[in-house]
Amino acid sequence: MQTIEIGNKAELQACKFLHTQALEILAHNFKALPYGEIDIIALDKDTLVFIEVKYRSKTKFAQAEEMLTYSKQQKLVNSASIYLQHNPQYQDYQCRFDLIAINESNINWIKNAFGVI
């Protein structure tokens, strides 16, 4: 299976999981050039959540949780800023950055995976 197909499958799995947790999915693969994309954007009650999905089929060398680098965090923050510029109706919402880490068949939802100063 190609890397993109694997990523899409993991993101779909994450969306289904978040739906069971009562989150409303607003966007999937939001493109925020030149920074990249945000895997999932959702509402958790009155909080706007930007979610990165990481998948590892083999955890011998690293867990999915370990794959969210500082550089990726900065890209997510910049991408979130672009999303808010394009969607001013969410400007006054609290924002949060979460990680959905999928290791083999386990899903780990890390709320507030990193903070923004």
UniProtKB/Swiss-Prot annotation:
SUPFAM superfamilies: Restriction endonuclease-like
Matching InterPro entries: Restrct_endonuc-II-like, tRNA_endonuc-like_dom_sf, UPF0102_YraN-like
Molecular function per GO: nucleic acid binding
PANTHER family membership: UPF0102 PROTEIN YRAN (PTHR34039:SF1)
Similarity remark: Belongs to the UPF0102 family.
Protein's UniProt name: UPF0102 protein FTW_1281
